[in-house]
Amino acid sequence: SSDLSPAVEQRLWDERDIPALQLMTQSVHEHGALAAIELVHNGHHSSNLYSRTPALAPSSRSLDIIYPKQARAMDKADIREFRRWHKAAAIRAKQAGFDIVYVYAGHEMSLPHHFLLPEYNQRIDEYGGSLENRLRLTKELLQDTQEAIGDSCAVAFRFAVDQMLGRNGMQAHEEGRAVVEMLADIPDLWDVNVSGWGNDSATSRFQPDSGYQTEYTKFVKQVTNKPVVGVGRLTSPDMMVSLIKQGVLDFIGAARPSIADPFLPNKIQQQRIEEIRECIGCNVCVSCDNLGVPIRCTQNPTMGEEWRRGWHPEKIVAAKTPQPVLVVGAGPAGLECALQLANRGYEVILSEASKQLGGRVISESNLKGLAIWRRVSDYRIYQLQQMDNVNIYLDSALDVQQVLELGIEHVFVATGALWRKDGIGRSSRTPILGLDQVAIYTPDDIMSGVSLGPGPIVIYDDEQGYLGSVVADHLSDLGHGVSFVTSASIVSPFTELTLEQKQVQQGLVAQGVGIYTNKTIASLSQKSGHVGVELKCHYGGEDQWLACASLVLVTERESASLLYEQLQQLQEDNGASSPMPIPMSVTLIGDALAPGLIADAVFSGHQGAQEFEADPERVQQGLFKREMPSLNA
């Protein structure tokens, strides 16, 4: 009665699920660590699209997903049955080799949490009403689990002490504290955070400070004698140590930071602080969970590729024959490619056309809310600067002739991409008419600090990613009057995957930005001597005209791949048109290959370095290596 399909989650429904989980616990134990499992029934947060079983909830209500179905209210028999299920699952967890078993009441995603919160629980029996009644099921689950496996397993309780809704939800200093006081020393471990998931895994755009949850969770150690673990995108080792020394936490929880750098604890212990790849809080990892695809990370391109491609975050295959390699362009792809080629032992020449390393990472980090993203370039630049086999040249744009003069046989081209100025994007493959009537800008202009003139600014977001709303917020914060036009039905729909969309749109509304959804810009025209944009409704609604002095187009990017194309052409004609030897290999990477997220660019750069001079058969196998269903079951 709890299935999140199509999301890919582990299951412990019956004994058949134990062997796969045992493989994990055995590996964890081989490294001297404890294995923990979080048992969860998702209540009305379940989709049950796979099982087709009606979802369960404290009170009847609509499902959390966009599907016209409701969860049914649990009766007393359902509650007894649920307790039995949970207890049996705890026993299976013990059999699978887990050392710590969780009862889960967080993120507004579990039945215990739903029972605990009045907005979900309108019962009038002993499981509803007062806090003591609403907490009853959670207390019973903790006691049931202790009884079943407490002789050999620790029982942990994950609890969101604050919903960050003020008086409209649970608050840490009121019912949140009361829950901890009422359960106090029943769990063996308190794992505390805030809810919902968008608050617990907040992006750096909206929660830039490391340890932002501490103000909500710091009371817990004062109330219980049991150890406490907490989270909050804790990336600073100094802060981690401080929280321990101050008695705020006993253990540091580092989920996203450990995705960015799985060797985070080792590097702290060994005082290798400069080698830590710090999480940037972009939530690309979260987006993959929401999409039901293998996890990935902007900072750590090996994440999710350990088995499929055999990549390791700290190790890489040494070069067969160390030789010079040229990387043209020092954005995220070029930096990562250069770093990994150097780690392999090649002599790397890194050429950057501008006076600063980092490319789009530096540009985007200049915008409001994205400063922490600069860590992507900071980490790689520092590592490259420590290496004797790397030579970096700034203010060094290279054309074909100059590349040939260098005489380097292997070239990687990471020359990025530029935003279009003609309006071509998702909704239209033809340019917007009349663009010559106003000043036209793109995110490239805004990120470089170009000053916009007076008068109303219209931002046209036909990309539907994150950047359009960032630019709108940035310009509004500078005091400009901004209107936001998008072909989507909401602002920046991609940010739903990163748990930010509501905050994004709320922020623009609070800034006074006019929002026009389901609209495309067909053309520019004049009315009463003023220039404006003609807005067309996707669904045939009434056309609108909007005054516009400056138009910022966030529609699509064009790869800056001319250098690659010219070098490739020389290879095509076997150098017949060149008086000098041509490179043996030319590889296009990053946005120059295919514009995407910064995470995509970093991955592309890493892939280029990994697969350089690799066995083609191994590369091909890595691309298609996948899990296959067994026909013997």
Language-model features, listed with the residues they occupy:
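Flavin-dependent oxidoreductase catalytic cores
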Residues: 2-328, 332, 337-343, 347-348, ...
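Rossmann-like dinucleotide/flavin-binding elements
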Residues: 319-351, 393-407, 415-496, 538-550, ...
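Hydrophobic, well-ordered secondary-structure elements that form the walls
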Residues: 190, 220, 243, 255, ...
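Short beta-alpha connecting loops at secondary-structure transitions
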Residues: 200-206, 227, 250-251, 361-369, ...
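A conserved short coil-to-beta-strand element within the FAD-binding core of flavoproteins
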Residues: 393-406, 517-531
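N-terminal glycine-rich dinucleotide-binding loop that anchors FAD/FMN and/or NAD(P) in oxidoreductases
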Residues: 276-280, 363-392, 425-438, 496-523
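Redox-cofactor binding/interface segments in oxidoreductases and associated redox assembly factors
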Residues: 103, 192, 254, 411-414, ...
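Terminal amphipathic helices with adjacent charged low-complexity linkers/tails
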Residues: 131, 358, 363, 414-417
